[in-house]
Curated annotation (Swiss-Prot):
Comment block on domains: Has the structural arrangement of an alpha-helix connected to antiparallel beta-sheets by disulfide bonds (CS-alpha/beta).
GO CC annotations on file: extracellular region
Protein name: Putative potassium channel toxin Ts21
Single GO term (MF): potassium channel regulator activity
Function: This recombinant toxin inhibits the mammalian voltage-gated potassium channels Kv1.3/KCNA3 in vitro with an IC(50) of 26.40 nM.
Signal peptide from the UniProt entry: 1-25
Organism of this sequence: Tityus serrulatus (Brazilian scorpion)
Disulfide bonds: C31-C53, C38-C61, C42-C63
UniProt keyword terms in alphabetical order: Disulfide bond, Ion channel impairing toxin, Neurotoxin, Potassium channel impairing toxin, Secreted, Signal, Toxin, Voltage-gated potassium channel impairing toxin
Location in or out of the cell: Secreted
Length: 65
């Protein structure tokens, strides 16, 4: 009976992990935490002079020239 519970917990944990969005290799530049981190990211990587968090749930850093 303990093995059944162990398998059930294992299956549930795998399902929960599978529902989490995969982390893409593209850096977000501090988004969705703050626009200031995004701007700092843009300046330090020479992508632009300022930046702003945009997109759904403000999860993408858009660098502005």
């Amino acid at each position: 009976m303990n093995k059944v519970y162990l398998v059930a917990i294992l299956v549930l944990s795998v399902l929960l992990v599978a529902n989490v969005s995969p982390i893409e290799g593209v850096p977000t530049g501090g988004c969705p935490l703050s626009d200031a981190l995004c701007a700092k990211y843009c300046k330090s990587n020479k992508y632009g002079k300022t930046g702003k968090c945009t997109g759904t749930s403000k999860g993408t850093c858009k660098c502005l020239v």
